[in-house]
């Protein structure tokens, strides 16, 4: 697998950011970056984690590196960093405020400093088997993946995507019927759910 480190600004990455599960998922980087490819789990960061990402960027502190896979058509998929990227993207589109300030309430200098922050991104090129092995390796740290989430990474496809769409939301029928039995953070993190 070929791996190269790149510095890409938030401004560049989030040009064309869209978060719409029904219409192509979560995309950025002029539509070339699939932030939530089929093997990725749903967004699971709690508000405190999400806010820490924004706080880190605003203070100019280093944010953990991210990994993207380059596809044959020169598009990219997020291998690691989805939670951080969605945290940033949702902040930029006014989904939440930090200290009662939305992104568009920042001063021009604050907004430019935020947008000019450089993300450290390793771009990886390799075959599907190499990408999966790399995905398993880099996901040892951070928000631990359940075994089922690793299985979901191996067996992607339309069936799994459709099942996740219908059964991995806190307002879905499966969650409403069985929420007392879930011993975790809900259907998004159910360790034994075969979504």
List each model region and its residues.
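Short active-site loop/helix that positions an aromatic residue
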Residues: 82-98
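N-terminal leader or domain-start segments enriched in small/polar residues
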Residues: 1-76, 93-95, 119, 165
